[in-house]
């Protein structure tokens, strides 16, 4: 993910200008990295170090989603629908 794509995601999912810390932005950025790494692992099946990193990112995203669901269920439903996550 290059800098331009990262700024685009922050702008799309941020609650205000320059918002990088909200759960929505963090979830969207992690989803982008997860999707990228998933493609890498389809080609490089024996890259177990990257697979561990992927599993850690998925766990981190799961924690952020659980936090958002506890805090504001509508924001949670919106981000899950926008990103097309299975829940």
From Swiss-Prot:
UniProt key word NADP: no
Alphabetical list of SUPFAM superfamilies matching this protein: S15/NS1 RNA-binding domain
RNA-binding in keyword set: yes
GO cellular component: a single term: cytosolic small ribosomal subunit
Keywords from the named record: Ribonucleoprotein, Ribosomal protein, RNA-binding, rRNA-binding
Gene Ontology biological process: translation
Gene3D superfamilies: 6.10.250.3130, S15/NS1, RNA-binding
Superkingdom in the source lineage: Bacteria
GO MF annotation list: rRNA binding; structural constituent of ribosome
General function of this protein: One of the primary rRNA binding proteins, it binds directly to 16S rRNA where it helps nucleate assembly of the platform of the 30S subunit by binding and bridging several RNA helices of the 16S rRNA.
Family the UniProt entry places it in: Belongs to the universal ribosomal protein uS15 family.
Subunit note: Part of the 30S ribosomal subunit. Forms a bridge to the 50S subunit in the 70S ribosome, contacting the 23S rRNA.
Protein name: Small ribosomal subunit protein uS15
Gene that this polypeptide is encoded by: rpsO
């Amino acid at each position: 993910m290059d800098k331009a794509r990262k700024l685009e995601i922050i702008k799309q999912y941020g609650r205000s200008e320059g918002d990088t810390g909200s759960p929505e932005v963090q979830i969207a950025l992690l989803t982008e990295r997860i999707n990228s790494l998933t493609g890498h692992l389809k080609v490089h099946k024996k890259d177990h170090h990257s697979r561990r990193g992927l599993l850690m990112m998925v766990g981190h995203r799961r924690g952020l989603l659980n936090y958002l669901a506890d805090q504001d269920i509508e924001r949670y439903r919106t981000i899950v629908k926008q990103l097309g996550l299975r829940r």
